[in-house]
Amino acid sequence: MTVDYKNTLNLPETSFPMRGDLAKREPDKLKNWYEKNLYQKIRKASKGKKSFILHDGPPYANGNIHIGHAVNKILKDIIIKSKTALGFDSPYIPGWDCHGLPIELKVEGLVGKPNEKISAAEFRQKCREYAAEQVEGQKKDFIRLGVLGDWDNPYLTMNFDTEANIIRTLGKVIENGHLYKGSKPVHWCLDCGSSLAEAEVEYEDKVSPSIYVRFPAESADEIEAKFSAQGRGQGKLSAIIWTTTPWTMPSNRAIAVNADLEYNLVQLGDERVILAAELVESVAKAVGIEHIEILGSVKGDDLELSRFHHPFYDFTVPVILGDHVTTDGGTGLVHTAPDHGLDDFIVGKQYDLPMAGLVSNDGKFISTTEFFAGKGVFEANPLVIEKLQEVGNLLKVEKIKHSYPHCWRHKTPIIFRATPQWFIGMETQGLRQQALGEIKQVRWIPDWGQARIEKMVENRPDWCISRQRTWGVPMTLFVHKETEELHPRTLDLLEEVAKRVERAGIQAWWDLDEKELLGADAETYRKVPDTLDVWFDSGSTYSSVVANRLEFNGQDIDMYLEGSDQHRGWFMSSLMLSTATDSKAPYKQVLTHGFTVDGQGRKMSKSIGNIVTPQEVMDKFGGDILRLWVASTDYTGEMTVSDEILKRAADSYRRIRNTARFLLANLNGFDPKRDLVKPEKMISLDRWAVACALDAQNEIKDAYDNYQFHTVVQRLMRFCSVEMGSFYLDIIKDRQYTTKADSLARRSCQTALWHIAEALVRWMAPILSFTADEIWQHLPQTESARAEFVFTEEFYQGLFGLGEDEKLDDAYWQQLIKVRSEVNRVLEISRNNKEIGGGLEAEVTVYANDEYRALLAQLGNELRFVLITSKVDVKSLSEKPADLADSELEGIAVSVTRSNAEKCPRCWHYSDEIGVSPEHPTLCARCVENVVGNGEVRYFA
């Protein structure tokens, strides 16, 4: 009768499931985290530690979250959790940007425009309610990602206290002398009826008319004399400009040239024209005239203040000098309309050029505009061309496709238009140079971010912070009704208004009667009706939120982390405001991530149908797979996502989960309080495995500390798949299953597995948060009660390295891994040739040189356990049979033969020692010892 020895084996057992079933299980985890107030437990556990503050850039409270939002929040969460594990107190307060045009437009669609069907006060309340709904919807999705934070107390830019603090930030800007009012060209959206911030402008291709226009000389004789070309050439004499915005011609007030460029008087067909010397040929080609003759040359400097007739109005305009004039295109003479271009405005100011003021807020020409009254600017383009043709001053017209600024919200072309606005001056108090100096004090990740924002700061115009909108933080200023000067008590008045806003929100300003605060001054001062640019709202949160929330303890902000578009957005506005108010950058480090694209590198788009939503990913794969994809992707460039890529992430996840399950299953029956083996008593291979984990942990900690999350994933995978999966965990199965349950051989192994599991779960937690929590709940209890959640814990301190006197050091085991790899290769060939079934059916002979023989001899009879074969002989390489193929590992050769011995039904090894015990005639001697004796003794493996 056959005896079943199954109950004498230590078979692995765990309730930790093989399948993650993440989409189903994760919501229950979240419920548990929030019922047990996990975030506050982390705060309590971290109290008193050194702080690390990552300040959340507020997403806009409108619409569902997209994959880019998910990437952003997951990266932040990985950093917060890893910093906690590294021993920092790292609070996370999520935020939302709640004012501004997109919300206004949504609410307009629901209830109509303010002051039409609904009062402005009611409209603001509707905007507030809409934003609150959007916040709640986005919040649920962010929480579902496994992101931990103070979700019950987020910061909203529409919170009354935040609105009040934004007003106080404006006060500091004024106090430090950075605010001024001026009429200046700003980006103006005709659909918004308002100015736009730099970050609200997108460049798209647009087809525009391209025209070459004649400005006839007031005195041809005077111009001939300047060019020393008296009596030369024939026909009328004109300066030629080129433009793609014909509608700006009515506002022309000058022609700009570069003082240092050479200009030619050219016979062009039957007329004489002035062109930059470098552009004569290209202009002649563009207008289709072959006959050209150079009549004279001068520097631009010599043309200054020469006068030319406006092409269709009855006045003349001067030639002025400007450094912005180049020979990159056009004619080298630039049509100058100070109302409609920043360079034009700046150079116009130097020459005291008048502002035309012909275009109203709705983008139409005012009633006094000759020829074009009441026409929209783009509608006027063909009319201007027609007028130029009519008066004989159109040299050439064609269509051109070029990059043109568009409104980010309406996707429609915008214009430059001079309007009275409030500005933060880049030069007023040296703000530009100070900001450039502060940029150099910041760590930029990746480092090219520094050059990018430096260039933007070097070239950016003054910041127009005023908007003509209803839903926004008001510019709570009082100005003189005649002089427009600020009230002398502006700072005190701002604080008084801020206190009221703190109690009642921004509506307190609109409800305020001037007399309440100004008394008799209300006769001569009025309230400013403008609101603040929303980039001022979010840009001031370093002060309006972080400096005022108790969780941050008044500490400086360590990091801002957003998409790479925020160099000109939130990073820029925050830098400008913090430098203006506090003379320093608001952050020590700035990390940017790339945009998400599909598997073919294309931007996500509804029209292409390639949008991957985080909701779909979580429903199909689970949050941990999405998190693993984010972590394993190099965020410094474009982040590619597709179903195929997510499936690969799921495969990687399974390997990690299987490793964790193996550890837990083999810790069955292990009680660290009772069974832990001291390092010096452990078996060599087990000590090496723990040391291996320590090496991995050091690399993983360093990678987390430097935000190299793809390195963390790679190191985690190498540890699970290579060092553990294909070597250590494979080798220990025999010892784990077959030795006596309480033997040193088994407890040593379990001790190693326990240390490794304690470390592994902490490495995983910042990335695979749901799974790490699941593993944590299955780990054996320790002497001191295990913390309820892994997220309150620091990286594991119990790992140890190999001692200096360790005979079988890491170099030894690395060599052995190479030998084992070669033996496995030869075994695989034998398996494929049907010479053997499994490795235990084989008897292996290793022919080795002296170095390898000495190496292998150190394991004695335990070498077979490392090679996972029933019998191993080691012989001198000189004894290698002539017909035995050379090994791929220099210094050894391997031969494999099928064992003729019997197979032990308990350990499955083939042995000549089966039947040595009459009581157990089918068992090998080793199994007899493990079943009824004191148990086999292992030293090395």
Curated annotation (Swiss-Prot):
Cofactor(s) this protein cannot do without: Zn(2+)
Any GO BP: isoleucyl-tRNA aminoacylation
One annotated GO molecular function: aminoacyl-tRNA deacylase activity
PROSITE patterns: AA_TRNA_LIGASE_I
Cellular compartment(s): Cytoplasm
Family affiliation: Belongs to the class-I aminoacyl-tRNA synthetase family. IleS type 1 subfamily.
Domain comment in the entry: IleRS has two distinct active sites: one for aminoacylation and one for editing. The misactivated valine is translocated from the active site to the editing site, which sterically excludes the correctly activated isoleucine. The single editing site contains two valyl binding pockets, one specific for each substrate (Val-AMP or Val-tRNA(Ile)).
Name of the protein in question: Isoleucine--tRNA ligase
